[in-house]
Design a protein with these regions (language model features):
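ATP-binding N-terminal substructure of ATP-dependent carboxylate-amine bond-forming enzymes
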Residues: 2-103, 134
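Short catalytic-loop micro-motif centered on adjacent basic/acidic residues
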Residues: 12-13, 74-77, 125-126, 162, ...
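A conserved helix-loop-beta module that forms one wall/lid of the active-site cleft
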Residues: 92-159
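Internal nucleotide-binding/catalytic subdomain
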Residues: 160-260
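Single conserved hydrophobic/aromatic residue that forms the stacking wall/gate
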Residues: 263-272
Length: 272
């Protein structure tokens, strides 16, 4: 390693898929020595990295060993959820500027997230944690009308199912559990209405809303995202309430630093 490289600041980037390529390129443009980790040895982002490690982005202990060896100035990711646990864990171990491990767990576990939001009186739909078929049947009886069935530990709309009738009860359970690493799901009341996504930036505990976008999905039963319209066309009053709710959600999860993406439904009032 030459003197120029030795004098460069190092950043570990978790993920080398096409989603992380812009992050890798930008880090290099900013003068960072990029150390990229991904379990896929053929991940396209490796082409742009200064150094690569073929390691899963959720293998926390293996990544900690990489970080202890490389001694980075920072560790980041983009467009993915679960690696935040690894980032927070390593951040606490090496005293890097990351969210706390407790916050990372709450932000990537939908049940723990709802518990944290509920504790701080942030508006959320009625929900039940389900670990087995018996819990599932009980939860269904406790929520009237349509229900949303979803994994607690998935993202990108994977595993979501809108349950509208009894004939799909088993189908919804199977779809959600198969998309959960620990086969744990949530049963929630369905909030029918338009959805928005809120992009926020938090620094030293102060959150600013960067953008509110109108969310376009495939609709029922899986609600897979197709596109976003930026900025939202909703009126100023609604945007203000959306911003307030997004900031409250960040505070409830104790997010002190970083970017957040919050999905909000506008069934009637209040927002959820």
């Amino acid at each position: 390693m030459n003197d120029e490289v030795l004098n460069m600041k190092k950043v570990i980037i978790l993920g080398a898929s096409f989603l992380q390529v812009p992050l890798i390129k930008t880090a290099k443009q900013l003068g960072y020595y990029t150390i990229v980790a991904d379990m896929n040895p053929n991940a396209e982002g490796f082409e742009f990295a200064d150094k690569k490690y073929v390691v899963s982005t959720i293998d926390t202990e293996a990544l900690l060993k990489v970080a202890e060896l490389e001694k980075p100035d920072g560790i980041v990711t983009a467009a993915t959820d679960m690696p935040m646990r690894s980032i927070a864990y390593i951040g606490e171990k090496l005293n890097l500027n990351t969210i706390s491990y407790d916050t990372a767990i709450k932000a990537t576990d939908k049940f723990k997230m709802r518990e944290a939001l509920n504790k701080e009186n942030v508006a959320i739909p009625k929900y039940f944690l389900v670990n087995n078929k018996e819990d599932y049947k009980k939860a269904l009886k406790n929520i009237k009308g349509k229900k949303i069935i979803k994994p607690v530990d998935s993202s990108g709309s994977r595993g979501i199912f809108l349950l509208e009738n009894e004939k799909d009860i088993d189908k919804a359970y199977k779809h959600a559990t198969e998309n959960s690493r620990n086969r744990t799901i949530l049963v929630e009341e369905y909030m029918q209405g338009e959805e928005v996504s809120v992009e926020t930036l938090t620094s030293k505990g102060e959150t600013k809303v960067v953008a509110i976008t109108d969310k376009i999905t495939t609709g029922a039963p899986h609600f897979i995202e197709n596109a976003h319209k930026i900025q939202s066309t909703k009126d100023k009053d609604i945007k203000t309430k959306i911003s307030q709710l997004a900031i409250a959600a960040n505070k409830a999860l104790n997010i002190e630093t970083g970017l957040s993406l919050i999905h909000i439904s506008e069934p009637t009032r209040p927002l959820y």
